[in-house]
Regions:
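Glycine-rich phosphate/pyrophosphate-binding loop regions near the starts of catalytic domains
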Residues: 34, 42-213, 219, 224, ...
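Helix N-cap motif at beta-to-alpha junctions
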Residues: 321-326
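Acidic, Ser/Thr/Pro-rich beta/coil linker or hinge segments at domain junctions
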Residues: 13-14, 336-380
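Active-site-proximal betaalpha loop/short-helix elements
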Residues: 40, 47-48, 142-144, 237-313
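Aromatic/hydrophobic pocket-lining residues that form π-stacking "cages" and hydrophobic walls in ligand
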Residues: 121, 157, 273, 297, ...
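Short amphipathic alpha-helices in soluble, non-transmembrane regions
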Residues: 328-338
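N-terminal amphipathic/basic leader segments beginning at the initiator methionine
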Residues: 2-51, 368-376
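Short Gly/Ser/Thr- and Asp/Glu-enriched loop/turn motifs at secondary-structure junctions
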Residues: 64-65, 311-316
């Protein structure tokens, strides 16, 4: 017998046995997470089966092995029947990223921790030039978390993954005693593929290049702050959380000479621009009036004494493109969902070296330093 056919038969037999055991019905009767759900026994199995496997619903997860195993052809996006036509994988590199999410509250205007956990890792891969393919999901659950809340976040992750075109292929769950956590923490790791033709990095940046952003800044951080209800002000600000991989692919397709990209999450736009300036040894000159900030968000920042350039974002990125390609870049982004407010905000200059300078609305200049402290803790 062909070893490949034998392997397929063995796999089918294992899957049949799993399905037969599951059909006996391992029911999740609890309304709240208990320590038993993290103990590895029947309660754990019921939680995994009835919340995660059924919630994410894909073949790789259903096998419930210690690792999600799938052909490289699937990661590359090639159909299995075309495997023989694929000469090799030498035209690609693999990219991997991981991030943990502890946002408080877990639901906020415009999104939730589940959606954020998928989008954040997808975006980290995308701005590295990778095409995101698969992600993992690790959960730290606090005893007493309503199962209904967990189901909601699992569904939010599934919806976000489908929108981003990625699959959740493996995961883990742990439960900590009440008071040892705060409802729900999530870690995600992702893998993507990078065509070798893409050369993104600070070493590609040149004097005269333009700095662009894909959208308005500071919405996410201020949305979470408002949702906490600790402040005497209220503002209907929605988080910008979204996957930006479609925007990135559009930009790289239209402007393959794009030099560098970053998503401006913790520390905001000001921090990532400082990191770029330090890495290149060049200066960054930006214009205050060119940076898109929604009026409601700017007003909330002003009332709290917070500079929006340091506030976290979860659905926009910053990029450096050649000066003669900036119009093409902006036209491309503005034609795509989520990129309507893309803007040219500045340029790369020789001096001041390794520094960021902002030209204010009044024609003056001020230094934009690295963020000091953490004015907005647990915003992602």
């Amino acid at each position: 017998m062909d070893p490949k056919n034998r392997l397929n038969q063995d796999e089918a037999k294992v899957n049949s046995n799993i399905a037969r055991v599951r059909s006996r019905g391992m029911k999740l009767k609890d309304e709240y997470v208990t320590l038993s759900h993290g103990a590895g026994g029947k309660a754990s199995a019921a939680l995994v089966e009835q919340v995660f496997v059924s919630g994410y619903g894909n073949r790789v997860l259903e096998e419930l092995t210690d690792a999600g195993v799938l052909p490289l052809t699937e990661i590359l996006g090639v159909f299995a029947e075309d495997e023989d036509a694929l000469a090799d994988f030498s035209g690609y590199k693999l990219a991997m990223s991981t991030d943990s999410y502890v946002v408080n509250p877990i639901v906020f205007p415009g999104g939730s921790i589940g959606e954020l956990a998928v989008n954040g890792t997808v975006n980290d891969l995308a701005v590295s030039g990778a095409i995101p393919k698969v992600i993992s999901a690790g959960f730290i659950l606090e005893e007493g978390l309503p199962i209904a809340d967990l189901r909601r976040e699992v569904q939010a992750m599934r919806d976000a993954a489908e929108k981003a075109g990625v699959r959740i292929v493996t995961g883990d769950t742990k439960v900590v005693p009440k008071g040892s956590g705060d409802k729900l923490f999530i870690n995600t790791a992702g893998i993507g593929i990078v065509p070798l033709s893409r050369q993104l990095g600070a070493d590609q940046v040149q004097r005269g290049d333009r700095i662009i952003v894909s959208g308005a800044i500071a919405d996410h951080g201020m949305s979470v702050m408002m949702a906490r209800g600790d402040l005497a002000i209220e503002a209907p600000i929605k988080s910008d959380t979204r996957a930006v991989n479609c925007l990135v692919e559009g930009l790289l397709g239209a402007v393959p000479q794009t030099r560098w990209m970053r998503d401006a999450t913790r520390g905001g736009l000001g921090t990532v621009l400082n990191e770029l300036a330090v890495a290149t040894g060049l200066g960054i000159a930006i214009e205050d009036e060119s940076i898109p900030v929604h009026d409601m968000t700017r007003g909330a920042c002003d009332m709290l004494g917070i500079d929006p350039i340091y506030v976290a974002n979860e659905g926009m990125f910053c990029a450096v493109v050649p000066a003669d390609q900036v119009d093409t870049a902006l036209e491309t982004l503005r034609a795509l969902p989520g990129g309507e407010e893309a803007a040219n905000i500045g340029r790369v200059v020789s001096k001041p070296e390794s520094s960021v300078v902002m030209v204010t609305a009044f024609g003056g200049t001020r230094m934009i330093d690295m963020l000091v402290g953490d004015p907005l803790p647990r915003i992602c």
